[in-house]
């Protein structure tokens, strides 16, 4: 199988490449934009600007992949808010170019989406719940999903992820370890507690207080399963257990044997609140993902199992 991956130097993409390398039946092509990978590159690299839809189409036609996993995404919400046309080209237009090109060459298309297609106000959502995004990022992801589902002749899977943590194997120093209004705070908490430093857990206002934290390697394995799955649809590839921010922090302390007293709930940083004053944040994300588990043949990690697996991955790097 010839597998084309975007975002291969990111958290999810590097984990997909790492898993695909272990298989003898996968030839890897990875698009590149920005810093070059720091690990040994034993696969094809294709320089590509996602904002150039014609370049996207030309790349897929050139490589004729059997499957494409589109992980690349803009993640700076403040920047996107102020540069909407640029973000739209790199997200919505790029997605449509990938999807149309995959339909043209007969490739299966896997698009990595987000729990932020929802507003965070419903008590429970599923793969079948209608999206209701509250910020520009979530709106673009929802538009991408709709464009994919409306394209005739396309074999596709939409894999939603949330609160991603783990190792960036391609460019380790790019790993985000900052506090966040969203739910990707696991790496931040581990980094602080491992140094014996206080980990401030923002409790509001304006935080994603509850979500399904997702280990990148676990999500990557589910996305690879989605490549080989023959059903079209939306699939939840995030962690199987929801938790709020403080519950997550204390589970981390339990698994890694850190000092719980260093976990300090605190109001959201007013400077960050001002920066995000025009960006709404989904508050509470809880999902039923049984349809995805049945289709893909297994459940994703629960919170403790995911953290234990991450602890083992960190130990293997020493």
Q: At which residue positions do the language-model features occur?
A:
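Mid/C-terminal beta-alpha module of Rossmann-like enzyme folds, strongest
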Residues: 222-277, 315-318
